């Protein structure tokens, strides 16, 4: 009898005989370390590194992940894992296990960013102006690694693991399209993770409740009357109006928001004019806004539009505001389920030691994983990859961003462990409730 089969067998026996609790608990606690050992095998590690580098060399933007999804499908086929494609344009959804309920989902995003890689190495991006600068190449690789681990122990799975290879996380709201496609129907829970160089290799971080902010984008066109820069009295200067708008927008957080309710409004784009001596007819500004509650988020949205249009009017200009929701949908706050967070701490603690769990503070960054959490219970976490030999490592969305490939076994085994343990514990809980009803 294999180790994983033994754990399942003992867990079910425990439900019939409570005296076996310590035995079943010990068996469950060994699953994560067993998976980590398997994922660290030289052949397994080298396979993951090869996949990650192939993806990194050929980055694709949101909803354009044609070759990436082709690679994912090819690897799933080699494993004998069934899948659906296309889902949400370029997404792939795989299935490992019994094919029946209960269902638990694991998610990885596949898209890259529109930036030129500046890191000089053998597997640098081959596509000009595109780069995996947020670790999504590693995320996809680790989920494929988890799929391989789970497939090797498919007979022991007490249900079905849904493998979500998602397109377009970077502003495209791919998760929303995955939900709309019905992928999460009958799924009990979903888990996602993200690489970070703010934690040491072998550490993980998360928190219960609000974790990442809700986010939205805006752009505004401010129109005046152009003319010669030497004769400003004959113009209506949109650059000056836009400058006043930007300053006024900063007051929304500093003077209108509760200091204990974290919010951000940032103007990150300003375009206007083409000559040193000509005042343009119009300028365009754009930016992002963030908040941890839906109420605060919608209030910011309302006030951003009011401030832009009214401040422009003060300067005798007209303004139109576009929140570009079709192109970049609003992301809700990422809020971790309480029970799933405790489950994550238990599993990661069994794998890495509870001392390697780091309680994180809320971040103003955003994640479209939140769309899943609006539909079903979900949990999001960070996996460390800090490389002390190459410290400091560049932050995500930097052209100098790098992934420490030593983290790949940790992410793959953590994914596989959470799915396996979740299904085992869910079955145990269901049987336990059934036994209690029979006793009544």
Curated annotation (Swiss-Prot):
Lineage, opening ranks: Eukaryota, Viridiplantae, Streptophyta, Embryophyta, Tracheophyta
Induction: By jasmonic acid (JA) and by wounding.
GO biological process assignments: auxin metabolic process; response to wounding
Effect of residue 226 to E: In iar3-4; reduces activity
pH dependence remark: Optimum pH is 8.0.
Name of the protein: IAA-amino acid hydrolase ILR1-like 4
Gene that this polypeptide is encoded by: ILL4
Gene Ontology CC annotation, any one: endoplasmic reticulum lumen
Stated family: Belongs to the peptidase M20 family.
Cofactor: record remark: The Mn(2+) ion enhances activity.
Residues reported in the UniProt entry to bind Mn(2+) 2: 134, 136, 194
